């Protein structure tokens, strides 16, 4: 179910304020955030945002195609390490 139109898209205010200030100053620093649920706004295009995956911050470069999506969609939280080994071991009974 999508978010109500009357509420509008969610973005953490402090994150948006940092991006707006960087746009005014012309800076391109990496911004750390734990807010995976924030929606990507057009003001964020061209910036790198380090999104927390539960263990570390993963840098995500924001491009035009990402606008409208959530930050957490681009950082995986689970790593697949493979199924069990296929080696046959001989056991002495």
Curated annotation (Swiss-Prot):
GO terms for cellular component: cytoplasm; small ribosomal subunit. Keywords: Ribonucleoprotein, Ribosomal protein, RNA-binding, rRNA-binding. It holds the Pfam family Ribosomal_S19. GO terms for molecular function: rRNA binding; structural constituent of ribosome. InterPro entries: Ribosomal_uS19 (IPR002222), Ribosomal_uS19_bac-type (IPR005732), Ribosomal_uS19_CS (IPR020934), Ribosomal_uS19_SF (IPR023575). It comes from the Bacteria. GO terms for biological process: ribosomal small subunit assembly; translation. Belongs to the universal ribosomal protein uS19 family. NCBIfam families: rpsS_bact. Protein S19 forms a complex with S13 that binds strongly to the 16S ribosomal RNA. PANTHER family: RIBOSOMAL PROTEIN S19P FAMILY MEMBER, SMALL RIBOSOMAL SUBUNIT PROTEIN US19M. This is Small ribosomal subunit protein uS19. It comes from Clostridium acetobutylicum (strain ATCC 824 / DSM 792 / JCM 1419 / IAM 19013 / LMG 5710 / NBRC 13948 / NRRL B-527 / VKM B-1787 / 2291 / W).
